[in-house]
């Protein structure tokens, strides 16, 4: 347990789509017959099973996250703790998603929960284009540290926050293959 009244930083790395669903009973698992396979993939049983497993993995991780949030509440930390959930890449279940700078590879979950002082407008959904650099600027602000003006990120909750017109991304290698790709994403 955490010491009472002291600030803390914790990082919990979940395995995401890199593992089998751990905590779902058979009756909780997704029926492959009920999933939608993206149009650019073969519409067959193999891909339906892959997509169903991915759905189950997400639900399995949801349970783990729920347990973490419940523990924070039980310890009286729910109203004083900021929780940030994000991924380092998009979907991991199909070819071209994880390692390619495409919409499927770049669109990541990004959720923040915390006290209103730091995370205003509880339950708000924003569709702004953001960069992981923005998370750096935001967390420095939460810690009371002024971030350098040269940093390319911005505090997502600042009064003067300006939505980005575009975000850039890239890939330099995939495993042992050098393959430099750059992208620009706009609305």
Per-region residue spans from a language model:
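Active-site-proximal cap/lid insertion segments
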Residues: 1-133, 140-150
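C-terminal cap/loop subdomain of S1 sulfatases and analogous C-terminal strand-loop tails that border
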Residues: 89-93, 133-136, 143-187
């Amino acid at each position: 347990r955490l010491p009472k009244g002291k600030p803390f930083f914790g990082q919990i790395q979940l395995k995401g789509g890199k593992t089998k669903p751990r905590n779902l009973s058979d009756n909780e698992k997704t029926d492959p017959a009920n999933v939608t396979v993206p149009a650019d993939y073969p519409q067959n049983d193999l891909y339906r099973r892959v997509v169903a497993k991915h759905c189950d993995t997400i639900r399995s991780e949801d349970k783990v996250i729920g347990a973490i949030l419940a523990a924070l509440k039980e310890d009286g930390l729910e109203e004083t703790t900021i929780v940030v959930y994000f991924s380092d890449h998009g979907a991991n279940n199909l070819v071209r998603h994880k390692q390619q700078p495409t919409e499927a590879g770049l669109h990541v979950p990004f959720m923040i929960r915390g006290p209103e002082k730091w995370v205003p407008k509880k339950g708000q959904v924003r569709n702004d284009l953001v960069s992981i650099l923005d998370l750096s600027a935001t967390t420095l602000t939460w810690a009371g540290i002024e971030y350098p003006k040269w940093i390319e990120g911005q505090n997502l909750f600042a009064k003067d926050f300006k939505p980005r017109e575009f975000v850039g991304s890239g890939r330099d290698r995939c495993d042992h293959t050098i393959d430099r790709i750059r992208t620009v994403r706009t609305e």
